[in-house]
Amino acid sequence: MGDGWRPGVADLVKNTPKVLNLKDSMKVLFLASWYPMNGRSGNGIFAIRQAEALAQAYQRFGRSVTVDVMAVQPRAWMGGRVQILGEVPGGPDQSTPRGDLRHWLLTYQDGRGGLFSLINQCWAWLRLLRAYHRHHGDRATVVVAQVAWKAAVVALLLGRPYGVMEHWSGYLEKEPPLKPITKWLVRRSLRNARSVAAVSPWLADALMQFCSGLRVSTLPNVIEEVHWTPPAVDLAAGQGAAGDVTSGSEPWRDPRVFLHVSDLAPVKNPALLFGAWALSGLSDQGYLLRVAGEYSQESKARYASVKGLEWLGILSPTELCYQLRSSRALLLSSHRETFSILAGEALLNGCSVWTSYPPLRSFYQGLDGLVSLPDDQPLTWSLALQEAAASNPHPWNSPQAVRLVQERLKPYRNHEAGQAMLSWIDAWKP
């Protein structure tokens, strides 16, 4: 295994705090295929939010249950070596109660070939599981695998009762991009699960097509509480200043500002986004496209020649809320979305959402603020941008309209989503 930085298993177990009074309580272990590299933001935050919501639900009912989240991630993804052993992390942005969720995370050396990578990952999982056992005095009662590959495969090997919670958009492709052996492992882990759920009806349908005979229910994602305070009625131009989250005041919604938030991966369709923006010519009229998210410097450089862009980088939940309340519309250019927490966050903050993805158009149908585009062609989007610039529509986000959004999205609030997760686990736990 060769990495000199790694402490031995004995040292790891010795240095992990042991809690002697937890052995008789129910223990729920979330295995996360992805773990956010930036705290409260980034790919994988959905797993943390669901685990927190579940932990808080157990607390509300006074049930003696511990909830932990565990992940093994490549160092390249996490930006270096990371070791979290049974910590309850806090942070400057306390917009969501944590529910005393305990985290376990190790990174492994990737990029050394398939066999070396597999050995490194197995070793990291073994270390974490032994440390978890030392802390709790026993194995997990039930396991929740967040995304089948690779968490459900690990859950299958553990031999504990487990359910699978799926978020991956790969199943929405005509042929999921998985190698044959990976497909076999994923299908076996799904079929051996006590229950399988997905975050949207269209993802559930795709999973059942991928794995014949599988029954898949739907469980909601979690939209953080910071987004549930209704925005103030839009101010007239000049009465505020967008982009200054430090002031604490309600931002002015700038009709000349559009927003996009993603890592600019191919599934997010950046070619459509930037192609339509450049074709529209709005930058020459003083319009601005703000781009936020976990994009790489290579992605940023690729579109450096496009005029009228402002790069924001990674945003905290509070910063995202501010930007959504500062922008005219969120441009959601994705080829596919399993649910899009971001679309819900935008509408809750009174920000219009533009999308051409049919399931999202259907899901949000009837809500003011949804701009449904007929296709994902740059010309279609550029013409829509030009038309928006030429018009001066009355703000859609009246208190009544935002209340309708809140009613539609109520199952995705922390309290309700946590209760749904608790009921799901109660239905299949031993």
Which residues are covered by each model-predicted region?
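Nucleotide-activated donor-binding/catalytic signature segment of Leloir-type glycosyltransferases, i.e.
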Residues: 299-318
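Short hydrophobic beta-strand element within catalytic cores of glycosyltransferases
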Residues: 352-356
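Conserved acidic donor-binding segment of nucleotide-sugar-dependent glycosyltransferases
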Residues: 367-379, 383-393
